[in-house]
Each structure stands twice: as C-alpha cells, then as structure tokens.
Swiss-Prot record:
The keyword Transcription does not apply. The gene is AIM11. One of its GO terms (cellular component) is membrane. Residues 136-158 are annotated as: Disordered. The chain crosses the membrane at residues 38-60, 84-106. Belongs to the AIM11 family. It is found in: Membrane. This is Altered inheritance of mitochondria protein 11. Keywords: Membrane, Transmembrane, Transmembrane helix. It is a multi-pass membrane protein. The keyword Transmembrane helix applies.
Amino acid sequence: MKFRFGEGAEGTLNTSVTTAMIDQEKRAADLKRRKNQMLLFGGATLATLASCRLTARGISSRRYIPKMFQANHMPPQSDMVKEAAMAVVFATTMALSSFSMVVFGVAWSQDVTSLKQFALKMKTKLGAQQIEDEIRNAPMTPETQDLQDQLAGALKKD
C-alpha cells in the first residue's frame, strides 16, 4: 500500500509495525488497569487485616482476668453504653473492610473496571439480555396496541 507525504514523496505503510504499536499501547493500558485493581484489592486487604487486629485487641483488653484471691464470678462494673458503642464500631469496620475486599477481589478476578461494565457482565452471565430481546420482539396484544394508539392520538391533539 502506497501513500504520499507531500509533493512527489512516496513511502510504504508497514501495517505490521502499526499493529504492533497499537497492541503495545493496549498492553500498557491493560497493565496499568490491572495494577490499579491489584492496589485497590491490596489496600482493602490491609484495611481488613488492620480492623481484625484492632477488634482482637479491643476484645482482649476488655476481658476480665481476676488476680489471686479475687472473685471470678463477679466482674468489675463497666460502662455498658461505651462497650456497646465500641462493639458496633468494631463490627462495622470489620464488615465494611471485608465487603470492600470481596468487591475489589471479584472486580480484579473478573476484569471489571466500572459499575456499568459490571452490570453488562452480570446481564450476559444471567441471560437477562436474551430475555429483554424476547420481550422487545414479542408481538403486542390487542389491548396494548389499542392503548398505544389512544396515547399517540391524545399526544397528537395537543
């Protein structure tokens, strides 16, 4: 294939070189995207490990260990509201960090980069696209056709 650069200059277009350049750019973008997904998953994993460690430390610090000759059936008085609030905080941080780790892990393994792409993949895997096509291509019932004609007529009058 020949093309002209200007007045009288001719050259040949090497399609294999341009294809290789495009493939290299795609690979670089793919590598960058996968690295970003890996870092998100790693961050969520670190958050999960940190929240588990803080929860374990919080639980062990509240455990009552009696000293020598102390009664073990009557733990000391404590603030129940504070302990309940801390339990909610610990449970929430563990649940959110675990959920984020699962979400980022699934997104990384399934190669999903956005919510729109996730929705499209789920539709294709669950067969929703085929069902939508069947409904779209289904013949209209006479009642539906009559209603559509009435609405079209009412909108044309205005």
